C-alpha cells in the first residue's frame, strides 16, 4: 500500500532542498 504521509514528506524534502 502506498503511504501518503511518506510521499508528502518526500515532496517537502525535495522542495526544501531546492529552495535552500
UniProtKB/Swiss-Prot annotation:
Give the start-end ranges of region Disordered.
1-20
Q: What else is known?
A: Antimicrobial activity is not affected by salt concentration.
Q: Does the keyword Transport apply?
A: no
Q: Which keywords does UniProt give here? A: Antibiotic, Antimicrobial, Fungicide
Task: List the transmembrane segments.
Answer: none
How is the subunit organization of this protein annotated in UniProt? Heterodimer of a large and a small subunit.
Role according to the record: Possesses antifungal activity against P.infestans but not F.graminearum.
Which domain of life does this protein belong to? Answer: Eukaryota
Q: What is this protein called?
A: Antifungal protein 2 large subunit
Amino acid at each position: 500500500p502506498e503511504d501518503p504521509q511518506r510521499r508528502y514528506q518526500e515532496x517537502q524534502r525535495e522542495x526544501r532542498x531546492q529552495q535552500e
